[in-house]
Amino acid sequence: MIDLDNTLIDRDAGFRTGLLALLDDRGLPAEHADWIMEIDQRGYTPRPVVAKAMLDRLDLGLTEDDLITALIACSRDNARLAPETAAAIERARAAGHRVVIVTNGPVPSQTGKIRNAGLDRLVDASIVSGAIGTDKPEPAVFHAAAAAVGGSLADAWMIGDRDDADILGAHRLGVPSVWLHLGRTWTAPDYRPTHTADTVVEAIDHAANA
């Protein structure tokens, strides 16, 4: 099981690419991207909140609804998969492992990212929380991932960048995990990942060979 945003794909890089194009289209300086990225908080700030902050400071010539739609498109339409990540997925599957994406978020945006990154052609299944009505770290998300490939959590691993979603969810179910640290230090006192990785390629290879 592998998380999508900022794990399989660099969601922040994709969002920034789209954001810069949006600012350029509206005739605004690229320097605004920095504070917008801060408000965005890796995609965890609700889109209406980001849109309101932008409209309060910038003359975008857009309605709030149109800006929300544009912000969703920024990350969805610029989702890209690194070749080395694709190769790691292929190695894991060639070794007999089933690879399932497990991602929080609305179905249209998340499935759009998966498709635009070409992941729909590489993985065995994808579970989007919006389709099942609950988010990671709730057990139902992980059980749905196992069921999607006719498997069991008994021999599963979870890979992700979020301590409070990916790693906590795995911990509660007794599933070993790999945390993609992205330059951060682990701070949760009550649980820890089984392994910490510098890159998603390292994470996939570790889980596949454990």
Give residue spans per PLM region.
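N-terminal helical cap/lid subdomain that shapes the substrate entry/recognition surface
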Residues: 1-87
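Asp-based, Mg2+/Mn2+-dependent phosphohydrolase catalytic module
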Residues: 65, 86, 90, 94-210
